[in-house]
C-alpha cells in the first residue's frame, strides 16, 4: 500500500510540473486568506499549496476515496485549506469568490464521482476534517456534530453518552457527516425512524457572502433545501443539530447467504414481497454478489441477507418464520448486541472486533470504483433477476444492495425535506464494482452501463430515479453550470418534484451561482 501511495504521489507531482502555468498564482489567494483572518486564529498552518509539494500531495490524497479521480485535473488545484476555525471557512469562501476560483468542499471524500476534490477549472479544496467536534446532550436527546466528523466518530460519541440512544444514518464509519446528512443519508434504522434529514433540527452554514447562518437567519426555505438537496449547492455546512432516537439495550442481527443453487433467486423474490411489510423494527438488506461455486473454478451468485431487529432473538425468529421462512433462519445465525456494536456488524467487521476501529481514518487512497442507483416500485420478476445474474457474472467483482423502504418512510411526505423518495417505493438498488488497475477503467464503466441497462425494464421510469448520495455522472452532468437541459435531467432524477423549489431557493441564496459543480442545483432564472 505504501508503494502504491508513493507511485500515486509521483504521478501527481508530474501533473503539477507539467501544468504549473495553467492555474492562478496561489500567492494571491493565500494572501487574501491571511488578510481576512486574525492572529488569534491563524490560518497559515491550514493552507497547503504546491510550493510545499510533499504536504500538498499527502493532504490531497488522504481524503481521496475514488482513485478514478485521484489525479484527474489535479493541475487545476490552487490550494487546499484544511480549516481549523469558522473564520477559515468564511475567508476561503470570500477569497475564492473574489479571485474567480471554484470551491470544492470535502468532509470525508466519499463523493462517488469525486466532486469534493476535482474540477476542470482552477479550484480550491476546503477540507473540513479538522472541524469534527461532537456534543451530545442526553437529557434533551440532541447533539451538535461538525461537518468534518465521521459517522464512526458520531456513533462513538453517542455511545459514550448513552447506550440507548442512536442516530439513523449510514453503515460506513469513515463517511463524513457533512455530505452524508445533507444528501439524505439512510441506513438500517430508516424503516423505524426515517433518514438523516428527518432528524436535523438546526444547522450552521457559511453563505455566499461569508456570513455564518443558522436556521433562524438562513430561513426555512434554505433550511429545507440543505436537508436532502445537497449543501454544496447552497453554501458550506459547518455543523448539524440532530435529534437522537431511543433504541433498546439489546438488538439482534444476522447474516445468512443463499446461492442460486440453494434457491437464492426464490428467496430474494419472496423478500421483495415482504421486506417493506414486516414490522418496522426489522430491516433486512439483500446483497447479491459473485461467490465461488461448488465446483473448482466455478462462480455463482450468492445473495446475502443482512438484518437488524430492534429486539431479542425470540421475537425475531417468530417474525421470520411467518414472513420469510424460505430463508431458513436458525437461532445460531442470530447475534444479540447493543446498537453501538451493530455498527461494527454493518461495517462488515467480525463479531468481537474492538470498537476503536470506528475511529480509524485511512490515510491512503481508496480503490477505483463506480456505483449507480435505482428505485423499485414493483417486484422484479424471477426472469428479470436471472438476467441480472447473467450480466453480473461477466464481472470479476460486483454487487447490488437491495435496501427496503416501507415503515415510517411511507408516512413522511415527499415534500417534507428535499429528499423525495418516500411512499411508493419498495426498495432501492445500489450497483457497485471496484478494481485495482487503471487500465481496466473503461471496460468496467462500460460493463456497469450494461448492468444498468439490463435492470432498466424493472425499475422506476419517467424519470428513472436516482439517489443523490450515490452520485452518478452517467445520468447527466453540467460542466459549465449553465446547461439547462442536462441540469433538468439529473435534477429530476435526484429530486423529482422538489427540483423547482430547490432552484427557487438557489436563486435567492446564491443568485450568481458561485457554489456549483457538475451536478449542482441551478438558480431558477438560469433554468
From Swiss-Prot:
<dbReference type="Pfam" id="PF08031">
    <property type="entry name" value="BBE"/>
</dbReference>
<keyword id="KW-1015">Disulfide bond</keyword>
<dbReference type="InterPro" id="IPR006094">
    <property type="entry name" value="Oxid_FAD_bind_N"/>
</dbReference>
<dbReference type="InterPro" id="IPR016167">
    <property type="entry name" value="FAD-bd_PCMH_sub1"/>
</dbReference>
<comment type="similarity">
    <text>Belongs to the oxygen-dependent FAD-linked oxidoreductase family.</text>
</comment>
<feature type="disulfide bond">
    <location>
        <begin position="32"/>
        <end position="95"/>
    </location>
</feature>
<dbReference type="GO" id="GO:0005576">
    <property type="term" value="C:extracellular region"/>
</dbReference>
<dbReference type="InterPro" id="IPR012951">
    <property type="entry name" value="BBE"/>
</dbReference>
<feature type="glycosylation site" description="N-linked (GlcNAc...) asparagine">
    <location>
        <position position="341"/>
    </location>
</feature>
<feature type="domain" description="FAD-binding PCMH-type">
    <location>
        <begin position="73"/>
        <end position="247"/>
    </location>
</feature>
<dbReference type="GO" id="GO:0016491">
    <property type="term" value="F:oxidoreductase activity"/>
</dbReference>
<dbReference type="GO" id="GO:0009505">
    <property type="term" value="C:plant-type cell wall"/>
</dbReference>
<feature type="glycosylation site" description="N-linked (GlcNAc...) asparagine">
    <location>
        <position position="35"/>
    </location>
</feature>
<comment type="function">
    <text>Probable flavin-dependent oxidoreductase.</text>
</comment>
<keyword id="KW-0274">FAD</keyword>
<feature type="signal peptide">
    <location>
        <begin position="1"/>
        <end position="19"/>
    </location>
</feature>
<keyword id="KW-0964">Secreted</keyword>
<dbReference type="InterPro" id="IPR016166">
    <property type="entry name" value="FAD-bd_PCMH"/>
</dbReference>
<feature type="cross-link" description="6-(S-cysteinyl)-8alpha-(pros-histidyl)-FAD (His-Cys)">
    <location>
        <begin position="110"/>
        <end position="172"/>
    </location>
</feature>
<dbReference type="InterPro" id="IPR016169">
    <property type="entry name" value="FAD-bd_PCMH_sub2"/>
</dbReference>
<keyword id="KW-0547">Nucleotide-binding</keyword>
<keyword id="KW-0732">Signal</keyword>
<keyword id="KW-0325">Glycoprotein</keyword>
<feature type="glycosylation site" description="N-linked (GlcNAc...) asparagine">
    <location>
        <position position="52"/>
    </location>
</feature>
<protein>
    <recommendedName>
        <fullName>Berberine bridge enzyme-like 5</fullName>
        <ecNumber>1.1.1.-</ecNumber>
        <ecNumber>1.-.-.-</ecNumber>
    </recommendedName>
</protein>
<keyword id="KW-0134">Cell wall</keyword>
<dbReference type="GO" id="GO:0071949">
    <property type="term" value="F:FAD binding"/>
</dbReference>
<dbReference type="InterPro" id="IPR036318">
    <property type="entry name" value="FAD-bd_PCMH-like_sf"/>
</dbReference>
<keyword id="KW-0560">Oxidoreductase</keyword>
<keyword id="KW-0285">Flavoprotein</keyword>
<dbReference type="Pfam" id="PF01565">
    <property type="entry name" value="FAD_binding_4"/>
</dbReference>
Amino acid at each position: 500500500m505504501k508503494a502504491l501511495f508513493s507511485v500515486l504521489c509521483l504521478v501527481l507531482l508530474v501533473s503539477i510540473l507539467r501544468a504549473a502555468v495553467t492555474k492562478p498564482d496561489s500567492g494571491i489567494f493565500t494572501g487574501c486568506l491571511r488578510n481576512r483572518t486574525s492572529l488569534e486564529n491563524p490560518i497559515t498552518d491550514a493552507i497547503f499549496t504546491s510550493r510545499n509539494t510533499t504536504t500538498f500531495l499527502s493532504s490531497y490524497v488522504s481524503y481521496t476515496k475514488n482513485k478514478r479521480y485521484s489525479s484527474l485535473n489535479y493541475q487545476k488545484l490552487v490550494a487546499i485549506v484544511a480549516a481549523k476555525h469558522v473564520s477559515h471557512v468564511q475567508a476561503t469562501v470570500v477569497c475564492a469568490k473574489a479571485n474567480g476560483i471554484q470551491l470544492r468542499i470535502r468532509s470525508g471524500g466519499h463523493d462517488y464521482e469525486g466532486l469534493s476534490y476535482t474540477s476542470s477549472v482552477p479550484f480550491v479544496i476546503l477540507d473540513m476534517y479538522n472541524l469534527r467536534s461532537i456534543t451530545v446532550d442526553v437529557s434533551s436527546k440532541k447533539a451538535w456534530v461538525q461537518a468534518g466528523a465521521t459517522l464512526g466518530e458520531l456513533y462513538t460519541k453517542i455511545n459514550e453518552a448513552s447506550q440507548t440512544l442512536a442516530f439513523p444514518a449510514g453503515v460506513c464509519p469513515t463517511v463524513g457527516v457533512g455530505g452524508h446528512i445533507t444528501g439524505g443519508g439512510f441506513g438500517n434504522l430508516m424503516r423505524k425512524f426515517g433518514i438523516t434529514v428527518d432528524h436535523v433540527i438546526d444547522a450552521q452554514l457559511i453563505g455566499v457572502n461569508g456570513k455564518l447562518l443558522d436556521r433562524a437567519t438562513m430561513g426555512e426555505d434554505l433550511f429545507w433545501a440543505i436537508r436532502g438537496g445537497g449543501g454544496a449547492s447552497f453554501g458550506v455546512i459547518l455543523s448539524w443539530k440532530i435529534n437522537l432516537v431511543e433504541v433498546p439495550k439489546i438488538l439482534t442481527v444476522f447474516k445468512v447467504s443463499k446461492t442460486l443453487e440453494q434457491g437464492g433467486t426464490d428467496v430474494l423474490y419472496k423478500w421483495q414481497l415482504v421486506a417493506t411489510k414486516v414490522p418496522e423494527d426489522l430491516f433486512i438488506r439483500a446483497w447479491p454478489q459473485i461467490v465461488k461455486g461448488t465446483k473448482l473454478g466455478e462462480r455463482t451468485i450468492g445473495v446475502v441477507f443482512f438484518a437488524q431487529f430492534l429486539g431479542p432473538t425470540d421475537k425475531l425468529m417468530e417474525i421470520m418464520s411467518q414472513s420469510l421462512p424460505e430463508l431458513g433462519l436458525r437461532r445460531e445465525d442470530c447475534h444479540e448486541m447493543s446498537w453501538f456494536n451493530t455498527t461494527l456488524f454493518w461495517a462488515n467487521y467480525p463479531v468481537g472486533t474492538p470498537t476503536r476501529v470506528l475511529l480509524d481514518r485511512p490515510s491512503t487512497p481508496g480503490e477505483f470504483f463506480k456505483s449507480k442507483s435505482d428505485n423499485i416500485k414493483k417486484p422484479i420478476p424471477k426472469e428479470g433477476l436471472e438476467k441480472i445474474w447473467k450480466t453480473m457474472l461477466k464481472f470479476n467483482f460486483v454487487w447490488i444492495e437491495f435496501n427496503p423502504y416501507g415503515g415510517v418512510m411511507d408516512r413522511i411526505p415527499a415534500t417534507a425535506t428535499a429528499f423525495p423518495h418516500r411512499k411508493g417505493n419498495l426498495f432501492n438498488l445500489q450497483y457497485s464494482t471496484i478494481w485495482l488497475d487503471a487500465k481496466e477503467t473503461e471496460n468496467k464503466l462500460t460493463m456497469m452501463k450494461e448492468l444498468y441497462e439490463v435492470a432498466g425494464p424493472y425499475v422506476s421510469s419517467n424519470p428513472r430515479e436516482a439517489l443523490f448520495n450515490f452520485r452518478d455522472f452517467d445520468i447527466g452532468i453540467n460542466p459549465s453550470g449553465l446547461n439547462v437541459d442536462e441540469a433538468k435531467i439529473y435534477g429530476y432524477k435526484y429530486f423529482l418534484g422538489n427540483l423547482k423549489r430547490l432552484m427557487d431557493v438557489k436563486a435567492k441564496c446564491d443568485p450568481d451561482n458561485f457554489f456549483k459543480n457538475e451536478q449542482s442545483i441551478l438558480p431558477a432564472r438560469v433554468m
